[in-house]
Amino acid sequence: KNAVTVGMHQNRYQGAPDYIMQGSSRGPLDDGRIKPDVLAPGGYVWSCRAQEAADTGGSSGSSQWYLEYTGTSMATPNAAGAAAMIREYLEEIALRESPQGALVKALLILGAEDVGARDIPNNDEGWGRVNLRNSLAPPDGQGVWVDDRSLLSATGNSKSYTFDIDDSGDQFKAVLAWSDEAASTWSSTQLVNNLNLEVTDPNGLTYLGNDFANGRSTTGGNADSLNNVEVVLIDSAIVGTWTVEIIDANHGGSR
């Protein structure tokens, strides 16, 4: 549940990037959690090849040094490379020492973009296709703010943040991800520490994490008690002060 699970989409070389390939595993997990987390290019990808490699099945344009291949074995390195660049950016540009893995995961999901119909999250693409620019330097003057140092140590604890939106029409996206303890093998659900994401707009409307309809957050739903990733995504956020609150709904573990 703490790992980044990657599905694969086609690339422009042999098809449409919005096409999720048949060989990409689908969710959900047994307890209903959303998987995969993101998509990355996995169709007809060129990669370095070991000189001793004998497997050329399903490939074309193979040589002693390179191999063209299709599968999540190609998509996962693409996502891993994006994750490595996010970590390097946090350390070298943002000067954030030892960023947590959950923060890197959150930024991957923050920048992910829906493919095909507007229907995230879903069990084909999770939160969408990795887009490194959206994760680190979004267009149109939008900013990214992160926190991976705050601690919630007991049920009922909470942490709030406020953000001022000055231009109407801006998109507002909040991502909460945390590294959860391992649950019992026999547990029907795998979430141990249940955190909830709540976003309140200037008019007092509250959006709960992962409460989505037609690819965008909606009001009036229920808090998520399965996933250790929660997202709120709102198009055309209204001008004013928005409040993001992280609530420790059930501190079931030792940390």
Regions found by a protein language model. Give the residues of each.
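Noncatalytic accessory or regulatory domains flanking protease catalytic cores in secreted, cell-surface
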Residues: L67, P121, E198-R255
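Hydrophobic alpha-helical scaffolding
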Residues: H9, S24, P28, E68-P77, ...
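Extracellular hydrolytic enzyme modules, especially secreted metalloproteases
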Residues: V4-R12, M21, G101-L132
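Hydrolase catalytic cores
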Residues: G42-D119
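Catalytic-core segments of hydrolase enzymes
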Residues: K1-S47, I109-A112, D170-A182
